Amino acid sequence: MPSELRSPRLAVLIDADNASAKIVDGLFEEIAKIGEASVRRIYGDFSNPRSKGWADTLSKHAIIPQQQFAYTTGKNASDITLVIDAMDLLHSGRFDGFCLVSSDSDFTRLAARIREQGIDVFGFGEQKTPESFRQACRRFVYTENLLAGAANSQDAASTSKPLQPSSAATPIIMKVITQMESEDGWVPLGEVGKQLANLASDFDPRTFGFRKLSDLVRRTNSFEIDHPKGGSMRIRTKSAAGSPPKSKTVTKTAT
């Protein structure tokens, strides 16, 4: 019998000093959409009261703590240990992807190095995370979007305040549509979603208060929407819809 397709095997490495324990339920729900969290480790000084929140969640999610005492002020042994473990796991050849949970730009080079090896990196951090780390990941998820109540409606905006207004998504969606170079301006929404992920690793409809890209597009009121019979939803910019066809310039010959 043919073997069943296996979910991507993931290594989840959490920086306890730069991630809140409040995200843990949403974090593993999000990771489950990507693959199987085969390794779950968290790094920090759990003798510190700041890490107590994480200590209370470890058993529920089968997270293995990697205790690192802060012997010297200003030296982060936890970060170093996380990087060493990540490289050991990378060279084991057993993983299809890594989930790095931190808002610390110090992990930018680690993410880039893992991707150089042809392995996907999924980052999870707060909106304040430096762009260098966000863009080093194949995909970056803002942890504010993982909290209970964040964009929890299936079809409309959440009652909680979004991280950014829906209008802020318009320029990047327009940019993608332009890059796709459709003759009549119409592009499939599914393809737009794929290109958005390639262009901006941290693009997420939930950041703007919506679970689905289609709902976000409708709310911006900047796009024409079409549902072809038997086809998928497609969109184009309203400016493209109202633009007259280009006319040829006729040069008069002097007589």
Please give the residue ranges for each predicted region.
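Domain-level signal for Mg2+-assisted phosphodiester chemistry and nucleotide/NA-binding surfaces
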Residues: 1-91, 120
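Acidic beta-strand-to-loop metal/phosphate-binding motif
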Residues: 13, 43, 96-103, 110, ...
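P-loop/Walker A NTP-binding module and the surrounding RecA-like catalytic core of P-loop NTPases
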Residues: 21, 40, 108-112, 117-122, ...
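Short, glycine/polar-rich helix-capping loops at beta-to-alpha or helix-loop-helix junctions
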Residues: 50-55, 125-134
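Short, structured coil segments at secondary-structure junctions
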Residues: 61, 117, 135-137
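Short, well-ordered beta-strand core segments
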Residues: 65, 98, 139-141
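Conserved phosphate-handling catalytic cores of large alpha/beta enzymes
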Residues: 134, 138-151
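N-terminal regulatory modules in eukaryotic regulatory proteins
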Residues: 156-255
